[in-house]
């Protein structure tokens, strides 16, 4: 499998997340310490506190996305490494509705990665996350987990719209969308009908589209387009 990723972009976002979270915490500390030594600044301490809290929360949110291990792209690459070079995976393409997309010989598979521990259920047509105290406390600085069925429908529609616009309707390609849970402590329970969601160890089986093989021209057009969005070549 061919892998496309702009490591400089990922590293830059990781550094910004760390700077924002550390900078916010330093401002919070300053809002407490400065008034102790400069009493005339006491009236401004709340400004530092609000700004610091906001920066810290934003920084922690993006640190969970860009710094937390295991990294989403590493997990996907490992799970799909047995695919041959007719499969191309693109991580974090710019101005694209999904962060990870797989071009296969038979279509496109968009992947929404969830890097959270916890228990998730799909029962009787309803999606539910078991909310623990720890998760509730971290909820504001962690990603939301949408219903995989709703996500899949919206993502497929958006990708079809984007591809039609980009290629003026000249390229038609089957599209599939999956929610992939990569955290080893995740519990995923699905009752009844299957849904477009899986844990990482089941991804290879799910990352397929039963369809005719794409013709060479649309396949190459899609490959070049996604490569340009991902690494800029």
Task: Pin down the residues of each PLM region.
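Surface-exposed interaction regions that form or flank ligand-binding interfaces
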Residues: 1-98, 103-109, 114-124, 129-233
């Amino acid at each position: 499998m061919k892998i496309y990723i702009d490591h400089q972009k990922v590293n830059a976002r990781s550094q910004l997340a760390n700077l924002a979270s550390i900078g916010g915490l330093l401002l919070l500390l300053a809002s407490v310490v400065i008034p102790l030594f400069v009493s005339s600044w006491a009236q401004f301490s709340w400004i530092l506190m609000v700004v610091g809290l906001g920066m810290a929360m934003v920084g922690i949110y993006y640190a969970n996305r860009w710094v937390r291990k295991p990294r989403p792209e590493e997990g996907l690459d490992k799970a799909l490494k047995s695919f041959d070079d007719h499969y191309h995976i693109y991580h974090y393409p710019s101005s694209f509705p999904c962060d990870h997309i797989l071009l296969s010989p038979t279509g496109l598979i968009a992947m929404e990665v969830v890097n959270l521990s916890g228990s998730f259920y799909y029962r009787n047509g309803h999606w539910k996350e078991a909310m623990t105290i720890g998760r509730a406390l971290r909820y504001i600085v962690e990603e939301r987990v949408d219903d995989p069925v709703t996500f899949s429908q919206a993502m497929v529609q958006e990708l079809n719209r984007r591809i039609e616009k980009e290629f003026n309707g000249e390229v038609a390609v089957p599209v599939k969308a999956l929610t992939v849970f990569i955290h080893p402590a995740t519990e995923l329970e699905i009752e009844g009908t299957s849904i477009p969601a899986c844990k990482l160890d089941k991804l290879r089986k799910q990352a397929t589209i039963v369809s005719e093989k794409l013709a060479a021209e649309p396949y190459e057009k899609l490959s070049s387009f996604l490569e340009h969005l991902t690494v800029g070549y």
